[in-house]
Amino acid sequence: MCALRRLLAKAADFIRESDKILLIICIFTSLYGCAAVFSATHYRATYRPFLIQFICFAAGVVAALIISAVDYSKILRYWYLAAALGVIPVMLTFFIGFAPEGTDDKAWLDLGFTTFQPAELLKICFVLTFSAHLSAVKPNINKLKYLIPVCMHGAFPVLLIHFQGDDGTALVFAVMVVFMLWAAGVSKKYFLAMIPVILIAAPILYFFIMNDDQRDRLTAIFGVLNFGAKRDPNEQWPTYQQWRGRTALANGGFAGQGFLNGDFTQNGIVPYGFNDFIFVSIGEEFGFLGCMAVILLLGGICFRCLQVARLSKKDSGKLICVGIFAMIFAQAVINIGMCTSVLPVIGITLPFFSAGGTSLFCLYMGIGLVLNVYLHRNSRTIYLHDNLK
């Protein structure tokens, strides 16, 4: 009887001390995302993408709760295991990588019953390893003998994913590195020193590293390819997706055409309307109001991550929250920028909305880490009732 009382007391404390606000926002966001995936794939007469999304959502919530229960300080002690867990699957893609239909990047592993994108897991593992590294050297972070290894650590996943062929995800890693370095207290002078380096590297990147398709997509944003010119609807060109996307968004108007009623969405006219361009599908069927709901929900998640970072008493906890914030923020901004023709198309999914089981499950792993930081935000260990009679 005492054991049962102790277990119930621990469960009650766990519920009371958990960040219910963040978890509830994430659940509502995922339900909205599942509905959007269902609608965007309805014309294909298959429920597989929706079922995968919903199953990974449910499994992700469970994983987040489990991860949140183990003190993150203990998890960080095994940073080397996190590094291996993140890097080894990515390395395997160089040898047995699988490229799904519609992409040339062999950035997936075929597990037989489903596919798995290791870069998504690497994001979470990198947040752990980089947080452990930064918190360990934080008092001396601005000394070059400590800063250089830190920068090499940050550059590793960026370069690894670049050579894998997924430059969009590499860019997300770069944003995560910058935000986490800033949060760790790296001096502004180092960030300012990077400006001339970026200015010098930009033309080299454009002329010698980018391929023709990437250059066309970038220059099209600035009107070099005459974005608004009349084109053959059946012809594929660098901004074809965005042209279709803008047309579908305009078709949605203020309140949208209604669930399962989008002319473009329900006829599969917008390429990848269930994945990279799901924001467009939402805009057509739910209109400006639906798009604003997406932005507010994702903004709420990002804001809550930063709030938890501020509440944490440990540097490692703050850095974990900032890393997860940066991951979600970067993906959301880039994806919405792609869909609205503000940024070039680089294959970034919209967090919690785009179809993709690996992405959604790993997102919840990241949310689990933020919940963990909130749960263990004080120095005392919670939900211990050893003195219960």
Predicted regions and their residues:
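Transmembrane alpha-helix boundary/anchor motif
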Residues: 62, 70, 129, 209, ...
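Hydrophobic alpha-helical segments of polytopic membrane proteins
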Residues: 62, 80-87, 145-161, 167-207
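Membrane interface segments of multi-pass transport proteins and intramembrane proteases
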Residues: 69-80, 96, 111-113, 139-143, ...
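Juxtamembrane membrane-interface segments at transmembrane alpha-helix termini
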Residues: 89-101, 182-190, 202-212, 229, ...
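Hydrophobic, glycine- and aromatic-enriched re-entrant/interface helices and adjoining loop segments
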Residues: 102-108, 193-291, 315-316
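Interfacial segments of multi-pass membrane proteins
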Residues: 134, 171, 176-190, 263-290, ...
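Hydrophobic transmembrane alpha-helices and their immediate junctions
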Residues: 289-332
